[in-house]
Design a protein with these regions (language model features):
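Cell-wall glycan-active module
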Residues: 1-154, 159-175, 180, 190-234
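Functionally critical loop-and-helix segments that line ligand-binding/catalytic clefts
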Residues: 186
Length: 234
């Protein structure tokens, strides 16, 4: 009988922890406190709560982030993995298609067009792989279930909501990397805010669809970080 009681007790305890661990984000105190303290997110508080209610944790994203190739591999291994013949071919085609803008960026920012093209290739294979993770799910998980970097990702989450609001995007549909980066150049939300620029003259910054905006934004990012032409990059 005592054994049965212990099993029942353990079952109830396990159930309690499951409720705590898997509580909906819109019901968690830490999430609601963040929401209360966050500056305007564009969307109303009720809208944000609704998005959070539809978002589930993605625990697998933490080991993916921790074991990212750029964190684990030496340059030789990283180069072997990313600098492939197919990617080089794409790079040649990309540079040919966007020669005029790459040359313009080199002239106006000092960043070599070949460097801009190379970064677009490394980051997303020239837009072919801009990430398949739901960005809201990633950022919410990393904001509240990854304590070591929670403050950083909470800033990204807030900026992600502002970005979606300003561009008319559905936060539930946006996809990106395991770190919440989006677009051909893989900009995290705060970098999107600070460094993304309009490259095609349509008075709109769109790193999800405009290659011209991505080219200009990559160049601007490097220029704003004091890119020095001819300096060693490795």
């Amino acid at each position: 009988m005592n054994g049965v009681k212990k099993l029942i007790g353990l079952g109830l305890l396990a159930g309690f922890f499951n409720v705590c661990v898997y509580a909906s984000f819109d019901q968690r105190e830490d999430v609601l406190q963040w929401l209360d303290e966050a500056d305007s997110l564009g969307f109303t508080k009720a809208e944000v709560v609704n998005y959070l209610a539809q978002t589930t944790a993605k625990p697998s994203i933490v080991p993916i982030l921790r074991n990212a190739p750029e964190r684990k591999l030496l340059w030789s291994g990283y180069q072997q993995r990313l600098v492939t013949s197919s990617r080089i071919k794409r790079g040649i085609e990309f540079a040919a298609e966007h020669t005029d803008q790459l040359n313009l960026m080199a002239k106006t920012t000092g960043v070599d067009g070949a460097i801009i093209a190379a970064i677009a290739g490394i980051e997303s294979n020239y837009g072919a792989n801009m990430g398949q993770h739901l960005t809201l799910r990633v950022l919410v998980t990393l904001s509240f279930d990854y304590p070591r970097r929670s403050q950083f990702f909470q800033r990204q989450l807030a900026e992600f909501f502002r970005l979606c609001f300003s561009q008319g995007l559905d936060p539930m549909l946006v996809k990106g990397s395991a770190a919440g980066a989006v677009g051909m150049g893989q900009f995290i939300p705060t970098s999107y805010r600070d460094f993304a620029v309009d490259g095609d003259g349509d008075e709109r910054i769109d790193l999800f669809h405009s290659k011209a905006d991505n080219i200009a934004s990559i160049a601007n990012y490097l220029a704003r970080h004091n890119w020095q032409k001819g300096a060693p990059w490795l």
